[in-house]
C-alpha cells in the first residue's frame, strides 16, 4: 500500500487525536521515579537492565525512555515468584492486581524476554520455570484458564457450575489458554536449544491439548465441558445448560470464552482457531524432534490441516464495504459475528502470532474493517481511537490494541502515531492500563496490568532495534 492510499484509507490519520499536539494532561511535567525500588523487585535481570540503560542513553525522547524503564520490566519487577522445585525451575506469574496465573497472560508477560535468554542464565531459568508451571496446570485441568499458586485454595469462583477443583481460580474454556504455552515453549526451545522442560510430563500436556481440541470440535456430541455462573453479566456465563449456542461440526474448534474471558456468541472463535493451527504445528515439530513421537506429531498436523481448511471455508465473509474479511466468530451454520476485541488473539493480531501474512489480502481488508467505525468495538474520541471490547464496556480503548496495531503495521507513520498516542495516554502514571476512556486517559481501569506494560515495552524495543528514527 502506498503512502497516499494509506492516508486516505486509514482511520488513524483521519482522527484528530493523532494529528493534534500532545494533550496537556498526557505527561507529567517531569518524570518521577515510579518503578519499584530495586530492593523490592521480585526478580532482576542483568540483560533487561542493560537494555533499559541502552534505551535511555540512545533514545532522546525522555518520556519514552521513562516509559520503557517502567513498563518493560514490569512483569519481572512485580509479578513473578521463582524457586527451584527439586531440580526444576518453577515460576508463578500473577497478572498484576489479580493473584492468579492465567496461562495466556503468563506466556505473554514473559514473551518479550526470550531474546535476552542467551545472555542471562537466571532469566532463562525463570522462563523455563514458567513452562514447567504451565505444564502442571494443563495436566491438572486443560479446560481452566487461571490457577492459584496454592493447589488447595478455593477462590471466588468455586461455586461456578463446572468441574471446579481446588487450586483453579477460573475454569473458562478458551482455546488460546492451550496455545500460548505451546508458543512460549516452542520459541524458548528455538532461542535456547534447551530441551529440559520438555519431558514426559510436558509431552503428556501436549497430548491433553490435542485431546481437548478434538473434544471441542464436537463431532460426536457436546463434549465434557459446560459452564454456568450466577451473575448479572451475560458475558460471564453460557446459555443452553452451559454449552453455549449450537454449532455445526465443520472441523473448527469451539471456544466457550474469548481471550477477554467474555463468553463467545458463536463458539467457533476465528482468531483462536488461527492460533491453534500455528500451535498445533509447533507442537508437532517438538514432539517429533524431542520425543520421537511420530504418531502424536501426525495427529497434531492432521488437526492443523483440518482446522486450516475449515477456516478457509467458513471464516471468510463478504462485507459490503471492505470486501472479503475474516469474521470474528462463526457457528458453521452460516451465522457470523463481525467485530474485533482488543485482547490477543484478535483478528488484528494474526500476523503477530504468525497465523497469517500481513500482506494477505483478506487480512488487509479485515484490518481496515476492525480499525474503522464499522467495528462496533472501535472507539474514537478526543483523546484517542482504538479497539476495546465488551469486557470493560462502551468508549473504553485498550492500550493493548494500539500497541498491537503498531506491532502489525508496516507503515512508519502508523507505527510512530501509535507510539505517540500511547505516550500521550498513560494518564500521568508512567504505565499502561487495561483500558482508558476515549476522551480522558485519566479515567482508566487496572493500574497494575503487567501484560499491557510488557507488550508496550516489546514494541518500544522492537522499534528501537529496527526503526530508531521513529522514536525521535
What is each residue range found by the language model?
Residues 47-60, 108-121, 180-195, 274-292, ...:
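Well-ordered alpha-helical scaffold segments within catalytic/enzyme domains
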Residues 99-127, 131-235, 450-466:
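Aromatic-rich carbohydrate-recognition surfaces in CAZymes
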Residues 67, 122-137, 195-214, 283, ...:
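Extended, well-ordered alpha-helical scaffold segments
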Residues 161-166, 171-174, 337-357, 395-472:
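C-terminal capping/lid segments that line or modulate ligand- or cofactor-binding pockets
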Residues 76-89, 152-161, 246-258, 428-434:
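Active-site-adjacent bridging/hinge elements
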Residues 5-26:
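N-terminal export signals
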Residues 12, 27-104:
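Low-complexity, Ser/Thr/Pro/Gly-enriched N-terminal "stalk/linker" regions
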Residues 103, 138-143, 147-150, 156, ...:
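Extended ligand-binding clefts on enzyme/binding-domain cores
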Amino acid at each position: 500500500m502506498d503512502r497516499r492510499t494509506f492516508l486516505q484509507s486509514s482511520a488513524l490519520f483521519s482522527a484528530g487525536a493523532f494529528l493534534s499536539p500532545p494533550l496537556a494532561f498526557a505527561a507529567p511535567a517531569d518524570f518521577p521515579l515510579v518503578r519499584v525500588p530495586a530492593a523490592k523487585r521480585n526478580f532482576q535481570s542483568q540483560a533487561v537492565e542493560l537494555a533499559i540503560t541502552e534505551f535511555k542513553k540512545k533514545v532522546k525522547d525522555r518520556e519514552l525512555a521513562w516509559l520503557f524503564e517502567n513498563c518493560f520490566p514490569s512483569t519481572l519487577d512485580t509479578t513473578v515468584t521463582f524457586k527451584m522445585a527439586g531440580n526444576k525451575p518453577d515460576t508463578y506469574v500473577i497478572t498484576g492486581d489479580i493473584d492468579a496465573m492465567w496461562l495466556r497472560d503468563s506466556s505473554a508477560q514473559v514473551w518479550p524476554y526470550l531474546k535476552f535468554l542467551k545472555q542471562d542464565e537466571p532469566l532463562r531459568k525463570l522462563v523455563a520455570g514458567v513452562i514447567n508451571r504451565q505444564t502442571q496446570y494443563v495436566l491438572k485441568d486443560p479446560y481452566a484458564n487461571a490457577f492459584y499458586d496454592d493447589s488447595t485454595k478455593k477462590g471466588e469462583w468455586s461455586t461456578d457450575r463446572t468441574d471446579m477443583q481446588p487450586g483453579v481460580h477460573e475454569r473458562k474454556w478458551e482455546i488460546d489458554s492451550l496455545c500460548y504455552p505451546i508458543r512460549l515453549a516452542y520459541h524458548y526451545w528455538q532461542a535456547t536449544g534447551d530441551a529440559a522442560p520438555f519431558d514426559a510430563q510436558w509431552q503428556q500436556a501436549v497430548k491433553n491439548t490435542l485431546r481437548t481440541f478434538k473434544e471441542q470440535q464436537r463431532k460426536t456430541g457436546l463434549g465434557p465441558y459446560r459452564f454456568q455462573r450466577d451473575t448479572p453479566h451475560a458475558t460471564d456465563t453460557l446459555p443452553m445448560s452451559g454449552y453455549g449456542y449450537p454449532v455445526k461440526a465443520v472441523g473448527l474448534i469451539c471456544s466457550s470464552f474469548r481471550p477477554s474471558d467474555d463468553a463467545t456468541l458463536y463458539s467457533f472463535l476465528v482468531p483462536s482457531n488461527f492460533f491453534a493451527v500455528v500451535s498445533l504445528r509447533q507442537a508437532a515439530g517438538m514432539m517429533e524432534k524431542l520425543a520421537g513421537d511420530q504418531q502424536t506429531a501426525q495427529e497434531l498436523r492432521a488437526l492443523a490441516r483440518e482446522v486450516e481448511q475449515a477456516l478457509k471455508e467458513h471464516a471468510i465473509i463478504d462485507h459490503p464495504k471492505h470486501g472479503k474479511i475474516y469474521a470474528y466468530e462463526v457457528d458453521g451454520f452460516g451465522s457470523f459475528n463481525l467485530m474485533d476485541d482488543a485482547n490477543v488473539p484478535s483478528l488484528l493480531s494474526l500476523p503477530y502470532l504468525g497465523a497469517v501474512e500481513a500482506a494477505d489480502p483478506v487480512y488487509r481488508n479485515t484490518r481496515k474493517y476492525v480499525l474503522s467505525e464499522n467495528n462496533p468495538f472501535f472507539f474514537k474520541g478526543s483523546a484517542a481511537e482504538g479497539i476495546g471490547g465488551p469486557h470493560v464496556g462502551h468508549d473504553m480503548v485498550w492500550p493493548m490494541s494500539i500497541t498491537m496495531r503498531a506491532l502489525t503495521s508496516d507503515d512508519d507513520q502508523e507505527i510512530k502515531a501509535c507510539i505517540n498516542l500511547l505516550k500521550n495516554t498513560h494518564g500521568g502514571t508512567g504505565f499502561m492500563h487495561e483500558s482508558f476512556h476515549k476522551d480522558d486517559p485519566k479515567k482508566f481501569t487496572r493500574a497494575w496490568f503487567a501484560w499491557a506494560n510488557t507488550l508496550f515495552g516489546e514494541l518500544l524495543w522492537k522499534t528501537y532495534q529496527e526503526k530508531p528514527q521513529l522514536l525521535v
